[in-house]
């Protein structure tokens, strides 16, 4: 009975998303922001430390997280992979076995917390990686931050009990706000991150994210994780945009040393400030 109730909640949210798609089409007739017409009002850092991999997302239709869902058009899914392309070590149906689970999630820029969702448990994980939602919200536990008049970041699927901010609180770039989890509609632990034009998860439109002071590198291990062969289509957009199959990280200190370690050329990174 509980599973039926949860499925009903997911169905209601899906219907709201469909309503949002229709509303945005009516309002804008398909003329939504893209990388040619929109530049972020804020320069964002990645909402985590260390090396993570983009496993979904980009700024073109071919590699978009969910192109037909305007709010999530420029969303990203991030997780951590080892040298074999695995996202876990040990029992693969246990959240704690996954490298990204419990890692700190950080505010991507200065802003104000405008919405927090904290009531979802972690969803179950299957060996087939079928997506489940064990809570009443497909976002799971989430945080919505306003960074500019029409720029809000959404960070979703957070670990139960890990959110350490409250509505109305001012946060700084790089400040811990929660931990990576497996709550909401998800197949395994990861972070869902997007920038949207308003507070609504349903009727806002997604915005391409300009990242600053980060590095990005094509990684061979991604192909071992995902057989969709989308990696080639996201290569030439960095900086400032990242795409599927790239290993990414923040550059906060010792910039040149980190770039050399990653095999990258300093000259390519015009968005890295000295």
Regions found by a protein language model. Name each.
Residues 1-5, 26-27, 41, 52, ...:
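N-terminal accessory interaction module
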Residues 1-28:
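Cationic-aromatic interfacial patches
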Residues 52-54, 105-115:
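Generic structural motif
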Residues 100, 110-159:
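Zn2+-dependent peptidoglycan hydrolase active-site motif and core
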Residues 151-174:
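Short histidine-centered loop motifs in beta-beta connectors
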Residues 172-184:
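Short hydrophobic beta/alpha edge segments that flank linear recognition/processing sites
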Residues 194-274:
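Acidic, glycine-rich catalytic/binding loops that coordinate metals and/or anionic ligands
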């Amino acid at each position: 009975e509980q599973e039926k109730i949860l499925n009903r909640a997911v169905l209601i949210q899906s219907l709201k998303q469909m309503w949002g798609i229709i509303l945005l089409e009516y309002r804008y007739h398909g003329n939504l922001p893209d990388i040619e017409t929109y530049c972020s009002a804020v320069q964002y850092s990645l909402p985590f430390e260390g090396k993570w991999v983009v496993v979904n997302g980009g700024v073109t239709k071919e590699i978009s997280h969910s192109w037909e869902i305007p709010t999530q058009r420029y969303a990203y899914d991030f997780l951590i992979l080892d040298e074999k392309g695995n996202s876990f070590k040990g029992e693969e149906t246990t959240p704690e076995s996954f490298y990204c689970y419990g890692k700190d999630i950080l505010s991507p820029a200065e802003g104000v917390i405008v919405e927090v969702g904290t009531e979802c448990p972690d969803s179950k994980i299957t060996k087939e990686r079928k997506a489940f939602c064990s809570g009443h919200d497909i976002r799971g536990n989430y945080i919505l931050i306003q960074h500019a008049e029409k720029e809000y970041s959404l960070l979703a699927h957070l670990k139960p009990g890990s959110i350490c901010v409250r509505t109305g609180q001012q946060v700084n770039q790089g400040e811990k706000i929660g931990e990576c989890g497996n709550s909401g509609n998800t197949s395994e632990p990861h972070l869902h991150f997007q920038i949207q034009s308003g507070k609504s998860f349903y009727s806002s439109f997604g915005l391409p994210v300009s990242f600053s002071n980060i590095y990005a590198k094509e990684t061979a291990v991604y192909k071992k994780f995902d057989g969709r062969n989308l990696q080639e289509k996201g290569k030439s957009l960095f900086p400032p945009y990242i795409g599927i199959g790239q290993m990414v990280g923040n550059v906060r200190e010792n910039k040149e040393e980190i770039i050399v370690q990653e095999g990258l050329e300093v000259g390519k990174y015009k968005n890295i400030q000295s």
